[in-house]
Amino acid sequence: MEVENIRLGSLSLDCAEPTPLAAFWAALLGGEVAFTSDNFVAVKTERMWVSAVKVDDYRPPTWPGSDLPKQMHLDLAVDNLAESEAEAVRLGAVKLEFQPAPDRYIVLLDPAGHPFCLTTQIPQ
């Protein structure tokens, strides 16, 4: 049962450098940086907020390895995998060599090393 008036409001990502990570997500999601401090940068998008939070001694996940596993990742719904991948890489994402389902999902890392997927498999 969906609880009325509860919606996804924000995603917070740990990182070593909040400013470039926030700039990446703002550009990729068509958002804008709305708040900045030394340890936190908030990006406002059309539907939600994404924030980059500075963490001392931050270490990115090593997925698909297990030394430091990912705790979560984003699946971004896109219309065209190739075009969306090219834009994400142009903005600073890195495409992983390991691609478990490249015809449906493209796995990338954001500038702080967080894995995320581009996919055409999420209905509108």
Pin down the residues of each PLM region.
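Short amphipathic alpha-helices in soluble, non-transmembrane regions
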Residues: 26-27, 86-91
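N-terminal beta-strand motif that seeds the catalytic metal site of vicinal oxygen chelate
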Residues: 1-22, 28, 71-78, 119-124
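Vicinal oxygen chelate
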Residues: 1-16, 34-35, 42, 44, 50-51, 62-83, 104-109, ...
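Intrinsically disordered, low-complexity, positively biased terminal segments
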Residues: 36-39, 69-71
